[in-house]
Amino acid sequence: MGHCRINGKTQVCGLFGFPVEHSFSPAMHNAAFQQLDLNWTYVPFRVHPDNLKQAVTGIFSLNMAGVNVTVPHKQRVMPFLDELEPAARIIGAVNTIVNNNGKLVGYNTDGKGFVRALTEEARFNPLGKSAILIGAGGAARAVAVQLALSGLRTIYITNRNQEKAEELARDILESTDTSASMIPWGNNLLGKRMVEVDLVVQATPLGMSPEVDQVPEFPFQMLTPQHLVCDLIYNPEQTCFLRRAKSRGSKTMNGLAMLLYQGVLAFELWTGFTAPVDVMRNVLHKQVAKG
């Protein structure tokens, strides 16, 4: 049918955020619905924080299939849901809501999207591996928790705000079987840990457009071809951090893959169908190129 033929049987899902005008999700999901000939549509909703509770009630009242949730609602939405999956509870944020026969269930597909990107795009299995995480904000939390739930052996977290890094390490220790510890920002210990880690994840905004020359303090000289280096930034697609890692021979992955697979997972939670990943990837690349 395609998403343009709206009728009485059309299933509606969408995005709750404030703002939402910048989102790539509508183009990505609607292209996927068209590809699979599903009578579904994805609509962005600009939801003021004061109206969030009413908007969530609207998912049930309007019989929507579900929504994505973006800033500033990812934490605030949690009390209004009937159920949370374990990862969302540990991360402390929800980015996908599924209307399961009137029960609103909160998921976090950000971290799962990153891990699926690792396995699908970089052929990297976190089971039994070790990682360094730079940053301790929302995206960093999602990635760290999901890596731990996926069997990561050890994670070292460094962040300018030391307390946030310590809190994240503590949450991982309490909720998973992964060993987690904080390393002070810019500390020499980071270089020493490089010999034992397999994965480096840059999860700060440093290097994001337009400040493309910014880069976190990091012992690049310790990188080798054995390391996989990821930057969660996708604009620009090749950050200064990734370019410096490539110059050391390390394998690299940018943030587009995580953005793609968090959407893929949300699509599959709502529809029950296997997402057309290539179609979604192509649309996403075009959207990012357009800015």
From Swiss-Prot:
Signal peptide: none annotated. InterPro entries: Aminoacid_DH-like_N_sf (IPR046346), NAD(P)-bd_dom_sf (IPR036291), SDH_C (IPR041121), Shikimate_DH (IPR011342), Shikimate_DH-bd_N (IPR013708), Shikimate_DH_fam (IPR022893), Shikm_DH/Glu-tRNA_Rdtase (IPR006151). It comes from Desulforamulus reducens (strain ATCC BAA-1160 / DSM 100696 / MI-1). Its EC number is 1.1.1.25. Transmembrane segments: none annotated. Pathway: Metabolic intermediate biosynthesis; chorismate biosynthesis; chorismate from D-erythrose 4-phosphate and phosphoenolpyruvate: step 4/7. This is Shikimate dehydrogenase (NADP(+)). Keywords: Amino-acid biosynthesis, Aromatic amino acid biosynthesis, NADP, Oxidoreductase. Pfam families: SDH_C (PF18317), Shikimate_DH (PF01488), Shikimate_dh_N (PF08501). Shikimate binds at S23, F24, S25, T70, N95, D110, Y234. It catalyses: shikimate + NADP(+) = 3-dehydroshikimate + NADPH + H(+).
